[in-house]
């Protein structure tokens, strides 16, 4: 708690300001982390959970690596299926969702953090990371990625001008993932990652969702609803880059599927969501609360405190920078 961590990774690059692995009930809070070669905070596996990541301010990460962000998590427990996760996707599927809790016993809570970046993802739940509750986070310049995993509940977060749109990547059927009451604002002018080492979705600029290698037939998430999204494209677009197909392992040249909001709703998603300006109070001064007349409030979004991130007043003033 209350640590200033910066300019790490002089020799090793696969490091983090805070790294948690094979541990239980660890709290990382009120830290200011920046100038990292890779993630600011990383949870290295799904054993045994119960961690709390809160009130951290993290920025300037992934300066020497890619496909990451301020917060990264890997599952990689004994029920994570490498063959399903990495190409080709469908030789065999991962184990049923319920088994992940044998290792990921307690939910990991990620809340009330401020992540700002110019590339990658703010919250990257990768390689089977399971049993997470993520809420009240502000991500500017980045959003989130859910790779294969289960029992992730993501709600009441704000993603603004992400280098990549919220991404659901290599989903499993019946994963029990839920995504609701979030605000997404995508602006094409800001969706140009400056770090070429990191991953951007190319032509997805301005889209609300990007999905990659989703199940061929089954549901992609258990719930996606009651979200407020806005883009200067002027309309809602979700894109599925390709679906998993049991009889075809070659993904090259597959035609992407694009969905309007009406088409998206026919799939069972975002039936109560709205495409509208969320009406932030003062975004230029990092106040991303929404005004009383915001359509997001009518959907169930709740304002959360702004500015209470990073170092506390107890941190020695001469050491601040």
Question: Which residue stretches match the model-derived regions?
Answer:
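Extracellular parallel beta-helix/beta-solenoid repeat domains
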Residues: 1-321
């Amino acid at each position: 708690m209350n640590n200033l961590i910066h300019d790490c990774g002089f020799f090793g690059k696969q490091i983090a300001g805070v790294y948690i692995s094979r541990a239980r009930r660890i709290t990382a809070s009120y830290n200011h982390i920046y100038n990292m070669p890779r993630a600011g905070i990383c949870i290295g596996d799904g054993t045994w959970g119960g961690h709390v990541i809160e009130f951290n301010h993290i920025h300037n990460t992934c300066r020497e690596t890619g496909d990451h962000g301020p917060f990264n998590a890997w599952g990689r427990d004994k029920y994570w299926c490498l063959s399903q996760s990495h190409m080709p996707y469908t030789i065999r599927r991962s184990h049923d969702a319920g088994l992940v809790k044998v290792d990921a016993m307690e939910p990991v809570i990620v809340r009330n953090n401020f992540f700002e970046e110019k590339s990658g993802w703010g919250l990257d739940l990768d390689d089977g990371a399971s049993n997470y509750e993520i809420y009240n986070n502000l991500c500017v310049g980045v959003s989130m990625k859910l790779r294969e995993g289960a029992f992730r509940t993501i709600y009441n977060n704000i993603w603004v001008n992400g280098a990549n749109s919220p991404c659901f990547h290599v989903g499993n059927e019946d994963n029990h993932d839920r995504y609701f009451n979030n605000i997404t604002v995508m602006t094409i002018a800001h969706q140009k990652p400056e770090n070429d080492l990191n991953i951007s979705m190319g032509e997805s600029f301005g889209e609300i969702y990007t999905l990659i290698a989703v199940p061929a037939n089954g549901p992609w998430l258990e719930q996606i609803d009651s979200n407020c999204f806005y883009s200067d494209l002027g309309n809602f677009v979700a894109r599925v880059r390709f679906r998993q197909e049991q009889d075809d392992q070659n993904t090259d040249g597959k035609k992407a599927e694009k969905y309007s909001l009406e088409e998206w709703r026919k799939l069972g998603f975002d039936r109560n969501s709205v495409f509208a300006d969320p009406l932030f109070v003062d975004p230029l001064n990092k106040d991303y609360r929404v005004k009383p007349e915001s359509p997001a409030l009518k959907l169930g979004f709740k304002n959360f405190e702004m500015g209470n991130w990073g170092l506390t007043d107890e941190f020695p003033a001469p050491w601040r920078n």
